[in-house]
Each structure stands twice: as C-alpha cells, then as structure tokens.
C-alpha cells in the first residue's frame, strides 16, 4: 500500500498505463486508487488500493468515486453514460469529461470529428454490410483495413482485406458495428501526447512507435525524424 499526502485520484483500469500513471503520481504527492475486473492487475502493487469490478459496473464506479477527489480512466472500454451518472451523483469530477470518452471510444465518430476539424485521416466508410466494403474497395482499391468501431486494441478488432476473397471472412472476424479505411503506406509511425490545463495546452516530446502484428513492441524517444516533421507533429 502506498499513501501520499496530497489529493486522491481514482483510475478506472489498472493495466500497464494505470501502473505508469500511479508511479508518476506518487512523487507528486497524489494517491491513486484503481479499479479493474482483473484481481492483482499490473497497477495494483503501486496503487494505494484496487477495487475489483467491471468497466460497466455502476457499484464499483460509485465506490471508487466516493473514495477519491478526482476520477480518470486509462482504458476506453468504460461506459461513458455510467461514468457521467456516477460523477453527477457523487460530485466527483471526471477528467477527461465522459463526453470526450464517448467521442474517442467510437473509431468512426472519432474519424468524423477529426475530418471535420481539418486533420488529415485515411479515407473511410461506415460499414453496415458487405456492400459498404465493396463500395470502399471500388473507390479506394485494395488493400483495405476493416475495424470494429468500439473495443479494439492490441490488434483486436482489425481485419486486413487484401482482395475480394477476404471480405466475408473479415466481416465475420469483426461481427459488429464497423468502419473500413483505405490502406496507408508509411515509413514510420509517430505519436505525441498533449496535456491540457486550465488555460493552456502543451505536448510531450514526439515518440516513434514500432508495432509487430499490430501490437506496440517498442517506443523510441525522442523520435528518429527531422526537425520539420517533429514540429509538424507538435502543431
């Protein structure tokens, strides 16, 4: 058990991200209590306590909210409606706001919002059936990437479509609300994290992420790229 003298932060999710968050919070005097469906989750040993409960369990959320000063989440599988309801009921602030979670948990809504904001994204279609995928193939050509709109991570919820013969099997793999994207050829993948305070937004250094079979295996910091590219990423 770790106890700090400052505020207490509740984190929904206790995976590797939750562990790193708790480790970073301790030197700042921030206590961390986590909740996760898995007992002895990665963040549990470095947090003050862990509650065991599902990501859509209102009772677990309520108990967590009543024990902390602020709530956050480290995984997108949380039900934003439940989180919003518990926050209002207990007057415990949630950051980011549950409305933000509702936006980012759905890949299609996320892509639509980014496109509306003028951020470059791969060409995409909403998928309600096989014809939508075939229409995308006619417009974009193969290969395509079929993605589950919700719940995908670490390669789960993705299915590559290299030709017409892959379409049915890809739809069977996803088996739910989906979107399809044009395939993007790239040299490397860069990632950047932004942080928002009361009156300003700042960024951490740009990193390079290396994936194998769609699972992150290595992060290189600082990213191996030219200054102009790094500045474009920050902007």
Language-model regions: role of each:
Residues 33, 72, 93-96, 122, ...:
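Structural detector of well-ordered beta-strand residues that form the stable sheet scaffold
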Residues 75-76, 148-149, 182-183, 196:
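Short secondary-structure boundary segments
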């Amino acid at each position: 058990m770790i106890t700090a003298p400052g505020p207490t932060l509740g984190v929904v999710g206790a995976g590797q991200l939750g562990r790193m968050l708790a480790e970073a919070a301790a030197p700042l005097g921030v206590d961390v209590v986590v909740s996760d469906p898995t007992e002895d989750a990665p963040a549990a040993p470095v947090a003050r306590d862990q509650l065991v409960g599902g990501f859509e369990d209102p009772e677990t959320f309520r108990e967590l909210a009543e024990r902390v000063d602020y709530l956050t989440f480290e995984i997108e599988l949380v039900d934003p409606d439940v989180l919003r309801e518990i926050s209002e009921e207990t007057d415990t602030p949630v950051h980011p706001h549950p409305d933000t979670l509702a936006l980012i948990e759905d890949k299609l809504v996320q892509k639509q919002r980014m496109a509306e904001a003028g951020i470059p994204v791969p060409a995409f279609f909403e998928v309600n059936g096989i014809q939508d995928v075939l229409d995308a193939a006619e417009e974009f050509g193969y290969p395509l990437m079929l993605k589950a709109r919700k719940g995908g991570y670490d390669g789960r919820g993705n299915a590559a479509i290299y030709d017409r013969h892959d379409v049915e099997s890809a739809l069977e793999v996803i088996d739910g609300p989906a979107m399809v994207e044009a395939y993007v050829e790239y040299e490397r993948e860069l990632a950047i994290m932004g942080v928002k305070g009361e009156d300003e937004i700042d960024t951490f250094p740009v990193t390079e992420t290396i994936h194998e079979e769609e699972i992150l295996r290595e992060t290189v910091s600082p990213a191996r790229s030219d200054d102009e590219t790094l500045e474009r990423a920050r902007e």
